[in-house]
């Protein structure tokens, strides 16, 4: 289990590459009736039930971001995910991969990393430094490693996932 946590701490998982404009556009184009995927909801519930946390954010698909992201918009916290990206990752590895990605994004919310995207767009909040971004990614990775270990993921599950993720991203 310690090796799994260490591996997940060393290899950055997700959250590279989304610009605030892409995320804002995705959220703005969604209606207030978010449609989600039951498989993603079930995976998220599995993560939250395992750590005893309540769901205080919205899980919503957001096509063409080729990733997943934790953010907030107009005071509501979201986890956005690209269904095709998640399917691609899972097709090349296993179900642990989507759990790890979602756990990483939950980690951003749990650790207080998500700031309202409108504040960034309006330049009310200063963009984080590279050092701060890396620190936050490691904190989210640590949380994901903790969750995955509690759910019973093996070191081989983590290795398979990280090998594919590095090729895809």
What are these regions (language model features)?
Residues 3-13, 17:
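Sec-dependent N-terminal signal peptides
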Residues 18-169:
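A Zn2+-metalloprotease active-site environment signal
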């Amino acid at each position: 289990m310690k090796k799994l946590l260490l591996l997940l701490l060393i290899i950055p998982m997700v959250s590279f590459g989304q610009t605030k404009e892409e995320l804002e556009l995705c959220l703005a184009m969604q209606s207030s009736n978010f449609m989600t995927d039951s498989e993603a909801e079930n995976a998220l519930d599995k993560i939250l039930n395992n750590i005893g946390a309540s769901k205080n954010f919205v899980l919503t698909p957001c096509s063409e971001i080729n990733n997943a992201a934790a953010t907030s918009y107009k005071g509501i916290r979201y986890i956005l995910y690209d269904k095709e990206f998640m399917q691609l990752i899972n097709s090349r590895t296993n179900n642990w991969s989507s759990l790890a990605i979602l756990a990483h994004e939950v980690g951003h919310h749990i650790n207080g990393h998500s700031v309202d995207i409108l504040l960034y767009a309006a330049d009310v909040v200063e963009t984080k430094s590279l050092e701060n971004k890396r620190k936050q990614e490691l904190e989210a990775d640590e949380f994901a490693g903790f969750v995955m270990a509690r759910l019973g993921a093996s070191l081989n599950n983590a290795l398979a996932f990280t090998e594919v993720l590095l090729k895809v991203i």
